[in-house]
């Protein structure tokens, strides 16, 4: 009995001294002076752990003592953030009566903040939200999605509410009452996830209204990651949106059943079905443009979807695999292969191979021109980003595993052939984002992931090219949501690219900010959101096309883009503006400088004269 007591009692000590000291130190109330830089405002601030109910009560008592002391010394109640909760009980009767009279005069129906500032007693006790308490409660629960909920809450709880994300977020459009920047969404998300938790605990399922509101948050994000560069605490809001999308899909609340079924059908046989679907889309767009020509404009104006609201940009019918006959060989070299020849594994993706094969052709031609051998997957591979953006994480993981295995096999074969494979290159920001998740550099440490323009621009510095524009004019460049330059912060990537273009071609490259309004399939699946973004982009394009004050000349050059999806989006904007400007990917524009306007047909002819394991194409 004694031995049992000796082992049982120490484990049940009531309150060790060191634990008491730690708690007292952590819950000690500190009355701090909080000063605003610039305006001279200095006021009291009481830091509180919102998950400690006892500390909250002590803080309220302390605030009451401070307010009482201030009023005894002749101080007044001010309202920097409002007087409605903490300070209302200290507001004098005369001032409250004056406020009541003022509200009755300007707001007789009591619409704005009803019953605010006119009653000292609060109708309910205010609730202070606590991320930590909610995380602990969810962790102790048995909810199936608790890991996702905890991950989301842990990510957004460090938000400082500074609002620096507003400056770069495409979804911040105050003129149209669009305030979906991460600062606002982080605050709303915490409250919604708390409601999701209690809904699951009480009902066993998430309320449909909550799912609808969560979906609204997710739809208002392109997952570009620009906000991460501005965020002082580095909250990956793009990843938060993707995680939320996955959570919604698991609840069958993604909101786009047709899109989901189409992606499920495509992902079962990517190499065969996706090229066929791209051909159908190209052919369908041509037919639709003709049919819409006879539809009355009054009807088209009523349509929200850009598919039915007007003509759309044309897309290529012949894909890269057919243009270069990659079944004859998918490795190209500028000269006879020697051991250690630099080689680039080029991943064209859907945009550079199916919708616009000229982007893929330009990429291969430029890489060959700069002395690199180029390897292209002989069959179509999709990076899977549409699956990730749709919340289909299981299908995305399966597709990524297949791609990783296939690309790793290609890399091993290239190394056996004597190539020095230095880069995995793309010409699309979302492709590069998705490929980075494969982590091929863990198997091949020497492999760097870069944009094709990032590889070729430094090597073209000595070419002495001149841009085909009149002296003194600018080249307009649309900055894509996803950064075009790897290895640098998102906001600096565009400056790096435009700076390299200016240095190479001796022209001024002017950036037109703002989302193009396409965002992959976003323009079709969420037209109410992306129509607003497209309208803002059209305004900025129209301003760029205005006559110059000095010469009176209008801009007549191309619009450069760094993303295949943006090529579609900007072309759609120009169609609606009735402006005729070529929309060129940066690689297309560079290839024109290197080999002329007719370079596409000549390069295809030279390439198709070769076959074999390594096809020698001199550029």
Identify what each model region corresponds to:
Residues 1, 32-42, 162, 216-221, ...:
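A glycine-rich, aromatic-flanked flexible loop/lid motif
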Residues 1-158, 176-178, 184, 246:
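Conserved glycine-rich FAD pyrophosphate-binding loop
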Residues 137-161, 197-223:
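Ferredoxin-like iron-sulfur electron-transfer modules
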Residues 160, 164-194, 220-247, 434-437, ...:
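Iron-sulfur cluster-binding cysteine motifs and their immediate structural context
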């Amino acid at each position: 009995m004694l031995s049992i007591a000796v082992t049982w009692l120490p484990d049940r000590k009531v309150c060790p001294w060191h634990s008491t000291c730690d708690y007292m130190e952590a819950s000690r109330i500190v009355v701090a002076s909080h000063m605003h830089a610039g305006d001279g405002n200095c006021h009291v601030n009481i830091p509180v752990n919102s998950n400690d109910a006892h500390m909250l009560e002590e803080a309220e008592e302390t605030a009451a003592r401070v307010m009482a002391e201030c009023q005894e010394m002749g101080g007044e109640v001010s309202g920097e953030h409002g007087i409605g909760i903490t300070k209302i009980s200290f507001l004098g009767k005369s001032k409250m009566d004056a406020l009541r009279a003022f509200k009755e005069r300007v707001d007789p129906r009591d619409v704005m903040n009803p019953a605010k500032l006119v009653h000292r007693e609060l109708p309910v006790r205010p609730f202070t939200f606590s991320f930590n308490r909610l995380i602990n409660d969810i962790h102790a629960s048995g909810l199936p999605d608790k890991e996702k909920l905890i991950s989301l809450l842990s990510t957004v709880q460090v938000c400082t509410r500074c609002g620096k994300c507003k400056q770069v977020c495409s979804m911040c459009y105050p003129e149209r009452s669009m305030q979906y920047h991460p600062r606002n969404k982080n605050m709303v998300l915490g409250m919604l996830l708390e409601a999701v938790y209690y809904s699951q605990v009480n009902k066993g399922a998430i309320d449909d209204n909550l799912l609808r509101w969560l979906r609204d948050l997710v739809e208002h994000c392109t997952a570009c990651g620009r906000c991460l560069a501005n965020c002082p605490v580095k909250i990956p809001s793009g990843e938060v949106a993707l995680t939320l999308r996955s959570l919604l899909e698991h609840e069958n609340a993604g909101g786009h059943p047709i899109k989901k079924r189409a992606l499920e059908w495509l992902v079962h046989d990517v190499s065969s079905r996706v090229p066929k679907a791209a051909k159908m889309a190209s052919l369908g767009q041509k037919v639709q443009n003709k049919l819409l020509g006879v539809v009355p404009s009054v009807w088209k104006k009523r349509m929200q979807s850009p598919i039915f609201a007007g003509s759309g940009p044309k897309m290529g019918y012949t894909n890269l695999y057919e243009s270069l006959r990659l079944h004859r060989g998918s490795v190209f070299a500028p000269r006879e292969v020697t051991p250690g020849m630099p080689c680039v594994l080029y991943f064209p993706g859907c945009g550079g191979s199916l919708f616009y094969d000229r982007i893929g052709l330009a990429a291969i031609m430029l890489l060959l021109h700069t002395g690199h051998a180029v390897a292209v997957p002989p069959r179509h591979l999709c990076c899977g980003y549409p699956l990730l953006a749709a919340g289909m994480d299981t299908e995305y993981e399966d597709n990524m595993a297949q791609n990783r295995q296939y690309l790793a096999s290609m890399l091993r074969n290239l190394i056996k052939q004597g190539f020095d494979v230095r880069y995995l290159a793309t010409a699309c920001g979302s492709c590069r984002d998705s490929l980075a998740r494969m982590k091929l550099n863990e198997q091949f440490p020497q492999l760097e992931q870069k944009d094709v323009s990032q590889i070729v621009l430094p090597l073209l510095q000595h070419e002495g090219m001149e841009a085909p524009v009149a002296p003194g004019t600018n080249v307009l460049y649309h900055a894509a949501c996803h950064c075009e330059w790897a290895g640098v912060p998102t906001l600096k990537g565009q400056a790096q690219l435009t700076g390299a273009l200016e240095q190479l071609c001796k022209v001024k490259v002017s950036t037109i900010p703002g989302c193009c309004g396409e965002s992959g399939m976003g323009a079709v699946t969420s037209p109410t959101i992306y129509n607003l973004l497209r309208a803002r982009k059209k305004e900025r394009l129209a301003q760029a096309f205005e006559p110059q004050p000095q010469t009176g000349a209008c801009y007549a050059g191309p619009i450069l883009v760094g993303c295949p999806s943006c090529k579609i989006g900007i072309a759609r904007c120009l169609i609606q503006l009735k402006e005729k400007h070529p929309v060129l990917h940066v690689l297309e524009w560079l290839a024109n400088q290197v080999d002329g306007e007719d370079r596409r047909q000549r390069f295809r002819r030279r390439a198709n004269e070769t076959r074999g394991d390594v096809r020698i194409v001199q550029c």
